[in-house]
Amino acid sequence: MMKGSLLSLVCASALLSSIAAPARADDTASYSIETEVKVLSDQRTRSISDSLNRPAMQLGVQFAHESGLIALAQLSTISSKSYTGSAGYDVLLATGWRFGDPDGWHYGLGLATEFFPGAKFDAPYAFDLNTGEPTNVRRTRYDTSYAVLELGWGALDARILNVLSKNYRGASTGGVCGQMLALSADPARALDCYARGDHNSRGSWLVDLDYKIPLSDKTTLKLHAGTQRIKNFKEANYSDYSIGVLHKQWGFEWSADYVMPKTKTRELFQVVDGNKIRSVDGNRLVLAVSRKF
């Protein structure tokens, strides 16, 4: 299934690129289509590993119109253990408008949705204190939709996302409290979580701040700070930081980023892998190489 989806996206990219080629060759071109293929030593989202600390691939196609309209389709490989039952990939679709001066104030507004085909989990949404048994087992998916606001000044960019879907990547009473109950040696915090009642995480906020410093014509220093505030589940709140270098050479972009997530509840960032439990929130050097067409 994953091969088929990758092949479909590659074919779509090739078709869109061939259609756009005549327009780009014309001085009156009003839009562009760019395809990017990337190989990474680890697929990290907000500094948390989606690929269980293993290598991953990304394929993206971006459409940009001179009016400011943009659209993005991106496929990334992920771990089916991190995202239970998944087909091994997720798909990000986004559209919106960007406007302003790239060297001064610039802005963006849009909508985005992440799909995790096949990914779902069953978890208890309540806990009976009288019997000591979890109850109300329900199925939850990881698919998430966002409203996106971008603000920037020169090389400084901020991105604010608000979760529109019922849950943020499965964050719910079953997803958060259930994970804590399953993996914690002391169930007290999980029971406190359940005691707050049945909640979802719609309305959560994700904020990122990025600054790029040119070191030369080909090399850029990247600085990042971010935070997420998950509605109804303070246990899932955390901040992340990274510092990296991007270098352009031989038609490729080479990058090295040291990512540092600062989480509060380790059980929420652990994955059962056979008879082992692996943490996906460790500090790590992430290497990547990409090519744009």
Regions found by a protein language model. Give the residues of each.
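Outer-membrane beta-barrel pore domains and translocons
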Residues: 38-42, 74-78, 98, 112-116, ...
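Cleavable N-terminal export/targeting peptides
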Residues: 1-32
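Short glycine/proline- and aromatic-enriched beta-strand/turn motifs that initiate or cap beta-hairpins
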Residues: 25-81, 180-182
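Repeated loop/turn-to-beta-strand initiation elements of outer-membrane beta-barrel proteins
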Residues: 67-73, 102-109, 155-160, 217-223, ...
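Residue-level signature of outer-membrane beta-barrel architecture
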Residues: 26, 63-65, 97-99, 113, ...
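Outer-membrane pore/translocation modules
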Residues: 84-202, 276
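Residues that define the transmembrane beta-barrel architecture of outer-membrane proteins
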Residues: 31, 53-57, 87-91, 105, ...
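Outer-membrane beta-barrel "beta-signal"
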Residues: 245-250, 258, 277-293
